[in-house]
């Protein structure tokens, strides 16, 4: 189109040749936080993602590299999956700094006979967001309080913990 080429997912993935269950990915793809972000909406029970997910991750995709580790299917731990990666942290927008965000998820998923499956996971996000002003807000008790950071252009810590079950 007149604005150039656009894409949703563009990455290279290298799978391990032995188990074909672990891989290294680099490019633009879904972040490994929670259950909903990693899956297409066609695979979810509702047509839209939860509002809280859309708030924290307005564009589900980000530029980064991720390692996925899984054991062989014959292992007693084959139901576990670890995804961990470094991401630009600004979705699919232009990169503005050299800081990277760490996102990881340890998940478990197992079939229940032929009719269903269960899953659970723990996610962690650690990164920074640029603050172009001298002001910031921090939580004190059950409300936000304005705080003077002293200088313009500081980076604020961005840290999320997540639990999911399905």
Cite the ranges covered by each PLM segment.
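Outer membrane beta-barrel
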Residues: 1-92, 96-103, 107-114, 119-124
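Surface-exposed beta-loop-beta
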Residues: 90-166
């Amino acid at each position: 189109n007149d604005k150039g080429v656009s894409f949703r997912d563009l990455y290279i993935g290298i799978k391990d040749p032995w188990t074909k269950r672990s891989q290294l990915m680099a490019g633009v793809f879904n972040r490994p936080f929670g259950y909903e972000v990693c899956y297409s909406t066609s695979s979810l029970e509702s047509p839209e993602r939860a509002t809280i997910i859309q708030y924290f991750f307005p564009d589900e995709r980000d530029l980064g590299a991720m390692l996925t580790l899984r054991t062989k299917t014959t292992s007693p731990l084959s139901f576990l999956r670890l995804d961990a990666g470094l991401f630009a942290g600004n979705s699919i927008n232009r990169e503005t700094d050299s800081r990277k965000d760490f996102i990881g998820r340890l998940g478990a998923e197992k079939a229940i006979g032929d009719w269903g499956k269960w899953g659970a996971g723990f996610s962690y996000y650690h990164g920074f967001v640029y603050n172009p002003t001298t002001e910031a807000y921090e939580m004190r008790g059950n409300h936000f309080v304005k705080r003077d950071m002293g200088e313009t252009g500081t980076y604020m810590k961005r840290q999320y913990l997540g639990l999911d079950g399905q």
